[in-house]
């Protein structure tokens, strides 16, 4: 088959893999709610944890992480090189953030970004997990913890693999969810006030949903 056609197939497949609306489906299946209308109204795993339940949240988190890895794996299976695999990774994030099934209103791409970087640099997974757990223990702030922990993959690409291409790509992948989250952070701060912003972002009753 023509190589250009294979590239197009890989990119389209990546978008539709990314657009699988796991948070929306979890809300409908487990609680008969539209996740876009409760909590933060975000199509992400944290909103599912808080408003649907712990195990549905784990399922959604695993699915969203898997979407990023699967998009790259499919491109690899189709015989595409790392450059096309990276483009497919970005298409998976685009699908997650702008799913055609939900009028292009999706999540922010954080979990999908984790899957992408974990697929590219599996040796960074234990470092990422360790960083996340340490930061969570210190800050009790999940969004901040997983965001800062992304640095572990960037360091693996830079110091471990000495691959500047992967470093730059990792930075791009990490910046997408960060930029997507800025409006939400401003909204929370404006509603809660600076003194209560952290409490509003992270509700400590997650254990009650076990």
From Swiss-Prot:
Record text on subunit structure and interactions = Probably interacts with PlsX.
Q: Which NCBIfam families match?
A: PRK14414.1
Q: In which pathway does it act?
A: Lipid metabolism; phospholipid metabolism
Keywords from UniProt, A to Z, are:
Cell membrane, Lipid biosynthesis, Lipid metabolism, Membrane, Phospholipid biosynthesis, Phospholipid metabolism, Transferase, Transmembrane, Transmembrane helix
Q: Does the keyword Membrane apply?
A: yes
List where the protein spans the membrane: 4-24, 52-72, 73-93, 114-134, 141-161, 163-183
Gene Ontology molecular function: any one: acyl-phosphate glycerol-3-phosphate acyltransferase activity
- Summarize the protein's role: Catalyzes the transfer of an acyl group from acyl-phosphate (acyl-PO(4)) to glycerol-3-phosphate (G3P) to form lysophosphatidic acid (LPA). This enzyme utilizes acyl-phosphate as fatty acyl donor, but not acyl-CoA or acyl-ACP.
Where is it mainly found?
membrane
| EC nos | 2.3.1.275
- Identify the GO cellular component terms for this protein: plasma membrane
Fetch the Pfam families from UniProt: G3P_acyltransf
Its recorded reaction(s) are: an acyl phosphate + sn-glycerol 3-phosphate = a 1-acyl-sn-glycero-3-phosphate + phosphate
Q: Which family does it belong to?
A: Belongs to the PlsY family.
**An individual GO BP term:** phospholipid biosynthetic process
Output the PANTHER family linked to this UniProt entry. GLYCEROL-3-PHOSPHATE ACYLTRANSFERASE-RELATED, INNER MEMBRANE PROTEIN YGIH
Q: Does the keyword Transmembrane apply?
A: yes
| Annotated protein name in UniProt | Glycerol-3-phosphate acyltransferase 2
Q: Where in the cell is it found?
A: Cell membrane
Q: How does it sit in the membrane?
A: Multi-pass membrane protein
Query: HAMAP family per the record?
Result: PlsY
């Amino acid at each position: 088959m023509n190589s250009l056609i294979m590239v197009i197939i890989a990119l389209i497949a990546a978008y539709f893999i990314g657009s699988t609306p796991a948070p929306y489906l979890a809300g409908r299946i487990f609680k008969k709610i539209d996740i876009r209308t409760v909590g933060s109204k975000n199509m992400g795993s944290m909103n599912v944890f808080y408003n649907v339940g712990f195990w549905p949240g784990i399922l959604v988190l695993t699915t969203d992480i898997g979407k990023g890895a699967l998009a790259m794996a499919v491109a690899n299976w189709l015989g595409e090189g790392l450059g096309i695999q990276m483009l497919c990774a970005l298409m998976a994030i685009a699908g997650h953030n702008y799913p055609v099934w939900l009028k292009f209103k999706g999540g922010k791409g954080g979990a999908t970004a984790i899957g992408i970087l974990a697929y590219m640099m599996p040796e960074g997974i234990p470092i990422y997990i360790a960083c996340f757990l340490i930061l969570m223990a210190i800050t009790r702030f999940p969004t901040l913890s997983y965001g800062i922990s992304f640095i572990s993959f960037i360091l693996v690409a830079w110091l471990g693999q000495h691959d500047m291409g992967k470093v730059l790509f990792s930075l791009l992948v990490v910046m997408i969810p960060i930029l997507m989250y800025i409006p939400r952070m401003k909204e929370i701060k404006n509603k809660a006030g600076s003194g209560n912003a952290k409490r509003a972002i992270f509700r400590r009753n997650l254990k009650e949903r076990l």
